[in-house]
Regions:
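A charged, solvent-exposed segment within the mature domains of Sec-exported extracytoplasmic proteins
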Residues: 121, 130-141
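Periplasmic/extracellular electron-transfer cofactor-ligation site
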Residues: 24-25, 30-57, 68-72, 83-97, ...
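N-terminal signal peptide c-region/cleavage motif recognized by signal peptidases
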Residues: 17-19
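Extracytoplasmic/secreted proteins, especially bacterial periplasmic and envelope-associated proteins
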Residues: 28, 32, 61, 73, ...
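Bacterial N-terminal signal peptides that target proteins for export
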Residues: 1-11
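Axial heme c-ligation environment in periplasmic c-type cytochrome domains
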Residues: 53, 59-60, 84-124
Length: 141
């Protein structure tokens, strides 16, 4: 009985840790959004950022991505759009107004920790994944 109780306590502790980690990832995604995206998309991701009047094409309302995609959040497409490296050959924007964040993140990798210097793509993927997870939570039903 004591072994079962210990096992249950350990399992519960692991679950709480995972919830805390997931929450911190969402908060990091939110911080990433506010520092990188809100200037165009707005703090609430509705496309009303302070730079909107100066852009040729208005930024989309990112809270409506799932609704515009038949009710399913298009995570892969969002990640590819944020990354941008597959679609752009030259410069930080290429032919689009949105920055190529994959390139920006790759160039900045290693500034925070040694692991990122060894594997900058990990940092790029983590940042884009956190940002995508945050956007998924903002979706209007």
């Amino acid at each position: 009985m004591i072994r079962v109780r210990k096992l249950l306590v350990c399992t519960f502790a692991i679950c709480l840790t995972q919830v805390a980690l997931a929450q911190s990832d969402v908060e990091r995604g939110r911080a990433e959004f506010l520092s990188s995206c809100a200037v165009c998309h707005g703090a609430e991701a509705t496309g009303d950022g302070p730079l909107r009047p100066f852009l040729v094409k208005a930024p989309p309302d990112l809270t409506m991505l799932a609704r515009r995609n038949g009710g399913e959040f298009p995570a892969r497409r969002v990640m590819d759009m944020i990354d941008g490296r597959a679609a752009v050959q030259i410069g930080s924007h290429g032919t689009r107004e949105m920055p190529v964040w994959g390139k920006v993140y790759a160039e900045g990798a290693g500034a925070d920790d040694g692991r990122a210097k060894l594997h900058p793509e990990w940092t790029v993927r983590e940042r884009i994944t956190r940002l995508t997870q945050y956007l998924a939570r903002l979706q209007v039903p």
